[in-house]
């Protein structure tokens, strides 16, 4: 081992000149520098920043006296002079000073005590980091040795492997004999240790995580991103990729054989016939061979025909289906993609938003029976041929509403594009099927081709209205030969398994003669038409149809009243039994929800007469007056054919229901406004499909009356008390007059014209006529009538919102409560609200008067605004005290004083006053004053007030339609409307921003019962049906208190409106609703 010669001089010449930079002086006392033997500068420059080559730490011997080690810019650690001397550093170098044997005292107290230089943690860190690196050790005699640094001892003895003496001039590599395996240099001999090309940061400068590697642009040594080449797949078939034909990856067998034979003399024994593996059959023409062949074929047939073989093969092949088809493939059976018909979607879940979007396109949805949840029955497509079954021709355009002949006047036929019929099966007796009303909603077009008059499929599909709620079958009574809307439209909602009927051509059905019952053959044919129905369903439907045909009878009512009460809405599944019944077959729809005739068509329609005359204006005697939403005049006796009404439930309902003393006799020639009294509230909150609840959407220009149809089927809204009506479906409503509308499809925003099935003079709004004819409704008419708030088309995008006013905390209004006809005010471009404040006809005091007022909110349409407040206040309107007002003969539509929101002026206290201004309740007894306050406050219970903000409403219709008529007050949704005396919370009010009153009030309501909406003024209004069952003097409110009301409300499927606190005068309360 080479020993460096002892030092002759106190300091080495190689040491740099002294510098002030880093002095690591060991205090005389023998203690180490405060930082552990390292001068201050080192702390900040532990590793030189320069390139790795520049950082080459060197170690020098540490004098026993305590010299330090310095690390220079070149990484040199030089031995330091004895203690008296300062240890200098070359310029720019950091010094690492450490005294041998010193304890730094740096470590935590509990750490073990190391000997010697091991206590200098920083120096030890650097030295261990360079283990394995090449180092040059310079000893005191000036010789330099090169080797690989291996380790060091606590006394700073350096062990170096593969050491050889480094020549002054590089003369190639060292010779083998000059290399010493290991040398230990004592600290006393070492002057300088130099490590070259050391990178202290190599372990920390890069990240080795997957993400760091993936982010590194240098992937697999490539610095640029790989350019993707387009894959040219060639033919989709895989013939080109057969392994046998692809020789690109190897030798052709023949080439190999040839190569081996030529180069190695090896001849292949390969035989393509593989004779060594198989026994070739030698075919010959001998008789014996042929007999063997025949015998083999016979055996094969026997084997293949044996049950065991077949069973085994069937198990393997499973009817020709592969494993993938059996276990993983998505099977889509049914009609083609083009048809959204129910049938094609049998069994498939369709998300609600999609159902809503597609409903108008004609996708038929069965109403689902689950939970009474309204199913959307698909509306007939807007286009003539959207229904799968509907005939594509123009002829198909004529659709009878509710299967009624489509001949009705355009007015009656006002298409309701947006309306969706929902049927909630839950209410139906299990036997019943509910069919969403035919696209009453869908536009009705006069039948262009006779063929479109296919008889409407029968009631089988026709859903019966839930008990107690009359389904406004067709808003207008339409002679419906088959009471059923297209079966396709309706689905059978009865408890019986829901069967969606495929929509049959609605038009076809409707065009058939209204009164005539479908013959069984026809029924079968229709059923057969429905695509995608399973046989089971078809059988079920046929059964239902036959049963219906056999059992369907018009039930004459001794008086219109009787007819109304006796028939639960359900009853109306009329399928006119025979042509003789055609007349009867026309059902009057009691849109108001007179439960009895819910499906009945207007009596007038019932006659075999052609359905409504095409002209909106003409009112054929045959045609019933356009049914006002409330109109369902009591159906003429016999009008209502309870189709297979469940006798039990019907009887029950009949017992429960009371006749409407105010009902007028039905005169087919007169337009008739039937009073719909919801005999019972529909049991299920779910929207009904029966009525064709169509909401006409009027185009902006048109002023629409509410169409007779209500949007009764709107999916119910499930509301928690806090919930706002979430589900309003926005339907565009147009204001066009019914007569006007029938002719064209509604403009984009408008719904197909609603039909006023009853023929009423074109001029009179159907509601008015109906109201006049029917007299005040006893009970809220169709439970469905729900308000449909729509916004003028202007704000199509906005959801209509109804917000409850805070003022009426106690009573949320429930859509269900509003049973009165929903008045749809459509707003055209101008939202003029025509509110007929006039109370909807109020029957005598004994009858509850419907209270709902509709205030339009017209904002921004100053000119129209006036209507809201007709200047003429009608005293009658003022709800004074509890005196019920009998219907006013023709209260002006706006009865309120200009300043005030119109209140229904029934004598009864109604909570639903709506003041355009702030809703401050004033006792109903107070006449509405210009003051902002509404009389509502006087009600014993606060009624929830809802304001609809016009702008907010995007033609939305709340689902109130579903709301059963059940008066909320009744604890049970199903409960029949309370009889007079029962308190109902009347409630709906719409607030609209106060409008300037300057405008003339728009059209007075000819009949008090129905608010007249001037056809001309289009305005969007949310209408809220009035609960008609209310009795004057009744305290609004549910028997059970607010919670019960809410619960009831939910049961009723109504929309619960919370209260809006602190509305300022002029503020709109918005009705909130969602799909």
From Swiss-Prot:
Location of the region described as Interaction with MPL in the Swiss-Prot/TrEMBL record:
98-121
Domain Sm: where? 122-199
Question: Which residues carry the post-translational modification N-acetylmethionine, per the record?
Answer: 1
Give the modified residues of type N6-acetyllysine: 207
The yes or no answer to whether the keyword Acetylation is present is yes
Pfam families named among the record's database cross-references:
LsmAD (PF06741), PAM2 (PF07145), SM-ATX (PF14438)
Record's bilayer topology term? Peripheral membrane protein
Keyword line? Acetylation, Cytoplasm, Isopeptide bond, Membrane, Methylation, Nucleus, Phosphoprotein, Ubl conjugation
**Covalent link Glycyl lysine isopeptide (Lys-Gly) (interchain with G-Cter in SUMO2), residues:** 348
The record's GO CC annotations read: cytoplasmic stress granule; cytosol; membrane; nuclear speck
Phosphotyrosine carried by residues: 118, 264, 309, 349
Q: Where in the cell is it found?
A: Membrane; Cytoplasm; Nucleus speckle; Cytoplasmic granule
Tissues where the protein occurs: Expressed at high levels in thymus, lymph node, spleen, fetal kidney and adult testis. Constitutively associated with MPL and EPOR in hematopoietic cells.
GO biological process assignments: mRNA metabolic process; stress granule assembly
GO molecular function: any one? mRNA binding
UniProt modification remark: Thrombopoietin triggers the phosphorylation on tyrosine residues in a way that is dependent on MPL C-terminal domain.
The UniProt regions of compositional bias labelled Polar residues, in chain numbering, are 330-342, 421-433, 874-898
Cross-referenced SMART domains, in alphabetical order?
A: LsmAD
Give the span(s) annotated as Disordered: 1-115, 316-521, 551-697, 733-770, 820-849, 865-940, 1022-1045
Q: Where in this protein does the record say Phosphothreonine is found?
A: 632
Q: Which residues carry this modification: Asymmetric dimethylarginine?
A: 361
Q: What does this protein do?
A: Involved in the regulation of stress granule and P-body formation.
- Record's subunit section: Interacts with MPL/TPOR and EPOR and dissociates after ligand stimulation. Interacts with DDX6, G3BP1, and ATXN2. Interacts with PRMT1. Interacts with CIC and ATXN1.
What is the name attached to this protein's record? Ataxin-2-like protein
Species this chain originates from: Homo sapiens
